[in-house]
Curated annotation (Swiss-Prot):
Main location: cytoplasm
Sequence ranges of Basic and acidic residues compositional bias: 14-23
Residues where Phosphoserine is found: S30
Gene: Aktip
Name of the protein described by the UniProt record: AKT-interacting protein
Length: 292
């Protein structure tokens, strides 16, 4: 080992020990000072105690998960959007009209044009949950119970939950319920029926089933002019044919309007231009001066 390295290392250790002693000797500790006790000012007489601030109350939530202050507007907007979708779908033979008194109640009627229930006219009412679209599926009740496996023979309610076991927001819509109500009259399903008699007859005795269906259609037709079950200005009601009232409306519906497109195509409408007809030079068209 090089002796110079050992000497230098030893001198470094001694220098470090000397510096530590010097630093230790320079440090002086002062005795702790006793801080004066803090005293609160005396409470004046007849002073009321200070109440603790209360935390703000949680914002009220409506049943559909929105803030209670704008919950009704959100519900109204949702139902308006649903009715717009119904109009756009143009379901054949299905007509609906929201109630005047409540947007959660819709009146409707279904016209069946062929099949086992041909010539059937079935009025119904749709009841929408007040927490729509976060609740269960809407309910659909026929004004007169129709003889059908999926219609309750007492209440006239259609088994809507069969098709919508869980109502999914932004995925299921009311127009789908209306389409389902129309489809059940063309495609009969007898599994887990609400009317067991109708299901058994459809499977075992189709002729007797058809006979009961015809009777049910006749009953609904005979009571078509009855007053609506719910008193509402927008409830759907039928009245006998009155030529003085209905002939004019019938002619308007049957008369086809002449298309205006052909007339517009034949008429040439000149637009603004600064090119003289027959010339390709820009700004060749002379401007007409107005006499003053």
């Amino acid at each position: 080992m090089n002796p110079l390295w050992s000497m230098s290392a030893g001198s470094v250790r001694k220098r470090a020990e000397g510096e530590e002693k010097t630093l230790a000797g320079d440090v002086k500790t002062s005795p702790p000072r006793s801080a004066p006790k803090k005293q609160l000012p005396s409470i004046p007489k007849n002073a009321l105690p200070i109440a603790k601030p209360t935390s703000p109350a949680p914002a009220a939530q409506s049943t559909n998960g929105t803030h209670a202050s704008y919950g009704p507007f959100y519900l109204e907007y949702s139902l308006l959007a649903e009715f717009t979708l119904v109009v756009k779908q143009k379901l054949p033979g299905v007509y609906v009209q929201p109630s005047y008194r409540s947007a959660l109640v819709w009146f409707g009627v279904i016209f069946i044009r062929h099949g086992l229930y041909q010539d059937g006219v079935f009025k119904f009412t749709v009841y929408i949950p007040d927490n729509y679209p976060d609740g269960d599926c809407p309910r659909l009740l026929f004004d007169i119970p129709v003889f059908h496996p999926l219609v309750d023979p007492t209440s006239g309610e259609l088994d809507v939950k069969r098709a919508f076991a869980k109502w999914r927001r932004n995925h299921n819509h009311i127009w789908q319920v209306l389409m389902y109500a129309r489809r059940v009259f063309y495609k009969i399903d007898t599994t887990s029926p609400l009317n067991p008699e109708a299901a058994v007859l459809y499977e075992k005795d189709i002729q007797l089933f058809k006979s009961k269906v015809v009777d049910s259609v006749k009953v609904c037709t005979a009571r078509l002019f009855d007053q609506p079950k719910i008193e509402d200005p927008y409830a759907i009601s039928f009245s006998p044919w009155n030529p003085s009232v209905h002939d004019e409306a019938r002619e308007k519906m049957l008369t086809q309007k002449k298309p205006d497109e052909q007339h517009n195509k034949s008429v040439h409408v000149a637009g603004l231009s600064w090119v003289k007809p027959g010339s390709v030079q820009p700004f060749s068209k002379e401007e007409k001066t107005v006499a003053t």
